Amino acid sequence: MFMGEYSHTLDTKSRLIIPAKFRNQLGDQFIITKWMEKSLRAMPMAVWEKLQEQLNQLPLGKKDARAFRRFVMAGALEAEFDKQGRIVVPNNLREYASLEKSVVVTGVGDSFEIWSAENWSAYTAETADDFDNIAEGLVDFDL
């Protein structure tokens, strides 16, 4: 399970070190894709395969379903670590997520997200202000 919040730095060659706890769970190859709230989502191949199945079941007659499927699939790439446990974040993903120097890597259960520190700070401030309402909206899920 991926959990926790880690601050890291993107170097001048667009390399990002991934926490060792996360690397151990990913395996040799994994997927990174564009995700919601201007973040990137990284996941083991098994999680990606499940997500692909879910995307393939979206109703192609609905414009939003086609858009979401295209966005996630077109934004995806297979990634692997270098010897120092880093990944290279390609320009298109770096630009989408506004990744510059300061980056936050956050565990979200079956995967983890990569955020610009600025976007993460804004997101967590907004979410913290509304956390009680968010939790109440999820009462049916027995959390």
UniProtKB/Swiss-Prot annotation:
It comes from the Bacteria. It holds the Pfam family MraZ. The keyword Ligase does not apply. GO terms for molecular function: DNA-binding transcription factor activity; transcription cis-regulatory region binding. Residues 5-47, 76-119 form the SpoVT-AbrB domain. Its main location: cytoplasm. InterPro entries: MraZ (IPR003444), MraZ_C (IPR035644), MraZ_dom (IPR020603), MraZ_N (IPR035642), MraZ_sf (IPR038619), SpoVT-AbrB_dom (IPR007159), SpoVT-AbrB_sf (IPR037914). It is found in: Cytoplasm, Nucleoid. The keyword Transcription regulation applies. One of its GO terms (cellular component) is nucleoid. GO terms for biological process: negative regulation of DNA-templated transcription initiation. Keywords: Cytoplasm, DNA-binding, Repeat, Transcription, Transcription regulation. Belongs to the MraZ family. PANTHER family: TRANSCRIPTIONAL REGULATOR MRAZ. Forms oligomers. This is Transcriptional regulator MraZ. The gene is mraZ.
